[in-house]
Amino acid sequence: GAELFDLHVNNLFKQGVNPEEVAAFIIESYQGWGAVFYPNDYIQAMREWSEKHDSLLIVDEIQSGFGRTGKLFGYEYYGVEPDLIMCGKGISGSLPLSAVLGRSELIELDPTLTSTHGGQPMSCAAALGHLESFVEDKLVDRAEKLGKKLLGWLNEWKDEFPDRIPFISGYGMVWAIFICKPGSKELDADFTDQLVEK
């Protein structure tokens, strides 16, 4: 993980990027197409690099935030604190609303900043009710517990079909089953489509 981050960042520098001009790294806490989480030490190396070079670590939690991974935010699996967190979708349960969370010294730099979906009253009211249900119904804990059950079932499938399911990926209620061509690690899109149709 950390070595891979070093390789990636050094490739940027070889292409002419000046390390002192890197304002921020912006990442999703996982890649949604396959519930692919980064290695912990990759993100930790990114955090260390950001601190050393006075740049920001910004995490996009628009898709991954609000409990679906078994933690309130997906970045919590990495043991780092981002400087800014971008939120949307899950914050209100369905209505258009976005938010940027972060360290107060950054948020207070320009209090006039606004956004299209940042303060619409109906969406804000829905978000408050939605967030209350997270606490009252312990939805994050529930996602974590159900995720452990789901992992057990997925591992049973993986054990039953090792030729087709070489690996699974995810946390909480976010999982991907990688269905591959028999005996290989090449994804089998046609077979996957047939399964989805059934």
Where are these regions (language model features)?
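Conserved N-terminal phosphate-binding loop of PLP-dependent enzymes in the Aspartate aminotransferase
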Residues: 1-198
